[in-house]
């Protein structure tokens, strides 16, 4: 079965955001057009971030797919690691604040930033 690699941003038991990769089976369709199962969604939002944009540490408000449409996006974690997503890149962001926790910018969440010579355009689907 052909698969698609899904980058997942999630919250570990210690409350810190981490990256992991999962495989999404593309088990239907034709050899020229392999398809995954249909995933439910309830909305989407487009975002434009100018050159130089960088957020503060924050948690994902709700699990959502992030697709980079134009430019490059870097996502950084508390441990100093980061990933750069180029146009066409994607990530499933699910690093929500643990139940009962109070947000601590030195422990929880991730930051995101525009990288490269072009503004960043992203699509969020939840």
Q: Where are the language model's segments positioned?
A:
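A short glycine-rich, His/Asp/Glu-containing loop-to-beta-strand
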Residues: 13-57, 63, 119-125
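Short, Lys/Arg- and Gly-enriched loop/turn segments at beta-strand edges
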Residues: 30, 83-85, 98-112
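Glycine- and acidic-residue-biased ligand/ion/polar-headgroup-sensing regions
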Residues: 61-79, 89
